[in-house]
Amino acid sequence: MKLAFLCILSTLLRTFAYNPDHIAGTTPPYLVYLKSDYLPCTGVLIHPLWVITAAHCNLPNLQVILGITNPADPMERDVEVSDYEKIFHHPNFLVSSISHDLLLIKLKRRIKHSNYAKAVKLPQHIVSVNAMCSVSTWAYNLCDVTKDPDSLQTVNVTVISKAECRNAYKAFDITENMICVGIVPGRRLPCKEVTAAPAVCNGVLYGILSYADGCVLRADVGIYASIFHYLPWIEDTMKNN
């Protein structure tokens, strides 16, 4: 009975916007679907040869897919699949922690600039509190969560202060290497989404999702690795490999 209720509620929520800034069905050109033999993750194209995602992603037999809106549809057009050469975890990442939760993927070939594949800009400064950001990832249909996600969605939410974030997540150490994006308090609606969603503010990548108690597509507060604070590692890794 509970499962049937969640299925009906999920269908209704997918029909109507979760908030006035909800968008569905369009793939941001920097967004990458990371398909594997485990759970998928969301990635971001930051260079024609490089994708960034969260280090907590487990990606055996990885496929890097660009331009996809519905991973459950094998007939979707304008999809580009790329092999990868090597994966680089941040050297300080620990599975038991949400700190330093970043991973770089070097592709085997350069991705050509197109309408559905374009590298996002990296930040030159820290993102400000109250900045408006777009958070994008794929959602599952709660009527059958055993299938691939079938709905690409974007929600527009704001960066919150460290104080607000620490109040929302008292059990976590919210460091200067993190940003938090979302609405306090969260909505806690039933949901299942692909992890490692990016926070892109004014066309610039500022965060990669490490953790959320709920779903970021429901505007729940997410804790993100702050891309600005990891630029030295990102740039050194790309330069030396």
From Swiss-Prot:
Q: Any idea which UniProt keywords this protein has? A: Disulfide bond, Glycoprotein, Hydrolase, Protease, Secreted, Serine protease, Signal
Active-site residues (renumbered): H56 (charge relay system), D101 (charge relay system)
Q: Which Gene3D superfamilies does this entry report, sorted A to Z?
A: Trypsin-like serine proteases (2.40.10.10)
Per the UniProt entry, the signal peptide is 1-17
| EC top class, as a word | hydrolase
Under the heading InterPro entries, the entry gives: Peptidase_S1_PA (IPR009003), Peptidase_S1_PA_chymotrypsin (IPR043504), Peptidase_S1A (IPR001314), Trypsin_dom (IPR001254), TRYPSIN_HIS (IPR018114)
The places in or outside the cell where this protein is found are: Secreted
Q: Which GO terms describe its biological process?
A: proteolysis
Q: Which reaction does it catalyse?
A: Preferential cleavage: Arg-|-Xaa, Lys-|-Xaa
Q: Which PROSITE patterns match?
A: TRYPSIN_DOM, TRYPSIN_HIS
**Protein name per the record:** Putative inactive serine protease 58
Gene transcribed to yield this protein? Prss58
